[in-house]
Amino acid sequence: MASPDRHFANAAIFTHSTGLTPNSGDAALYIKSDNKAYIKDSAGTEAAVGGGGTKTYAVFNANDNQPPATNFATLDTRNSIAILDFDDTTDESAIFLGIIPEAAVLGSGLKIRLIWTATTATSGDCVWDAALERMNTDIDTDSFDTAASVTTTTNGTSGVPNYSEITLTTIDSVVAGDGFRLKITRDANNASDTMTGDAELIAVEVRSAA
């Protein structure tokens, strides 16, 4: 039987040996300890296959909100786009429910990406919080893990979307296949939240932080 590290002219070699340098005209393809595929040419140059892009695990829009019983963001529309209005004086929240997909990489936590705009403001900062709950306890009681936050200055032109990203490392020990709830809150009473008027949440992305 031929060795898996055997060279063939102008061929891709599938190998477990990350230290292998292919012969001229060959390329080596292998999986590293981070479970990502890499390719190496005969000059020894290594590159991640597929560009090493991040993985999106869930996407939510305003209509996916399952609001809390009190202090909830209000469903609204803007130019027929569904949005959630978050007050500038009271902390209001939205909750989204999903399932962590198979083969999700969670060792570094999750990144929560928010797309939002201001109702009228063209200046000021908005503070957003994100908290995750693993759905493995009594659903009659909330059990969200510690929240993480981000502060973003709103766009200087009304109606232009802002993009805020929160790195969430406290993820309630969630694993692939688990149901989860994600709570998004505008921390309106935070001294760093200086934006006047509502913040309008358009969409939320949950993706790998790796």
Where are these regions (language model features)?
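Glycine-rich, low-complexity segments
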Residues: 1-16, 36-79, 136-164
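Proprotein-processing/basic-patch segments
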Residues: 186-210
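Extended, low-complexity, turn-rich repeat/linker tracts enriched in Gly/Pro/Ser/Thr and Asp/Glu
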Residues: 102-107, 117-125, 136-138, 191-192
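Short beta-strands within extracellular/lumenal beta-sheet-rich domains
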Residues: 88-104
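Cysteine-clustered segments with highest specificity for TGF-beta superfamily mature ligands
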Residues: 162-191
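Short carbohydrate-recognition loop motifs
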Residues: 75-89
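Short coil-to-beta strand junction motifs in C2/discoidin
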Residues: 122-129, 197-201
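Short hydrophobic/aromatic-rich beta-strand motifs
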Residues: 23-40
